[in-house]
């Protein structure tokens, strides 16, 4: 009979060999080469699939910059990890962004699709703040209020119906079982 510590060492060794073989097989079957570590690269390189024409276009920034941490703040959603805003002039390209690889079909579709919302720093044409102050919005405010009241009434009626149903039909927890 084998001693207990020897048996445990044998089991641990067999497990390590099996895990090592499994790891090497999965690495051999993967199609893409492993990414180099941060130390091997020298400095941290940001993973980007494209370059946005405007930093104010948050949807574009979120799509293009793959390693950004987004933090919800009370007034806005702020991207962290982008560094300082660019000090160059805004591009006058008709596209939303430029892809780094033309073979990335998702990126090409996203960057070159029309129409895409224009981002503006100052309230101007088409900005949400302008829409709040137009007379067109004020005329539909009554309709919005009516719809909100309808939604509230429907929710209230549904809740009352559920409460009445619960008090009317007290079901046993074992209603499907027959007593023998």
Swiss-Prot record:
- What GO cellular component entries does it have? extracellular space
Indicate where this protein resides in the cell.
Answer: Secreted
Q: Cite the residue spans of the region called Disordered.
A: 157-180
- Which positions correspond to the propeptide? 27-47, 71-180
Signal sequence residues: 1-26
Disulfide bridges in this chain: 50-64, 52-60
By its UniProt entry, which SMART domains does this protein fall under?
END
Give the region (Endothelin-like) as residue ranges.
Answer: 97-112
One GO molecular function term of this record is: hormone activity
Site positions for Cleavage: 70-71
User: In terms of one coarse class, where is the protein primarily found?
Assistant: secreted
The Gene Ontology biological process terms listed for this entry are:
intracellular calcium ion homeostasis; regulation of systemic arterial blood pressure by endothelin; regulation of vasoconstriction; vein smooth muscle contraction
Q: Name the UniProt key words of this record, in alphabetical order.
A: Cleavage on pair of basic residues, Disulfide bond, Secreted, Signal, Vasoactive, Vasoconstrictor
* Family stated for the protein in its record: Belongs to the endothelin/sarafotoxin family.
Q: What does this protein do?
A: Endothelins are endothelium-derived vasoconstrictor peptides.
**PANTHER family per the record?**
ENDOTHELIN, ENDOTHELIN-2
Q: Know the name of this protein?
A: Endothelin-2
Please tell me the species this chain comes from: Atelerix albiventris (Middle-African hedgehog)
Gene that this polypeptide is encoded by? EDN2
């Amino acid at each position: 009979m084998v001693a207990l510590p020897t048996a445990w060492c044998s089991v641990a060794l067999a497990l390590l060999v099996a895990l090592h073989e499994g790891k090497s097989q999965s690495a051999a079957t993967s199609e893409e080469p492993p990414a180099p570590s941060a130390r091997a690269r020298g400095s941290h390189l940001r993973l980007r699939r494209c370059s946005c024409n405007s930093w104010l276009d948050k949807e574009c920034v979120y799509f293009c910059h793959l390693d950004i941490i987004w933090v919800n703040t009370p007034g806005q959603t702020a991207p962290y990890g982008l560094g300082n805003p660019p000090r160059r002039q805004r591009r006058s390209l008709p596209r939303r962004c430029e892809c780094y690889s033309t073979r990335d079909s998702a990126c090409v579709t996203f960057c070159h699709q029309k129409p895409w919302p224009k981002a503006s720093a100052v309230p101007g044409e088409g900005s949400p703040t302008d829409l709040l102050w137009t007379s067109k919005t004020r005329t539909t405010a009554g309709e919005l209020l009516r719809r909100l009241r309808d939604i509230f009434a429907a929710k209230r009626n549904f809740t009352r119906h559920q409460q009445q149903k619960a008090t009317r039909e007290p079901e046993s927890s074992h209603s499907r079982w027959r007593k023998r």
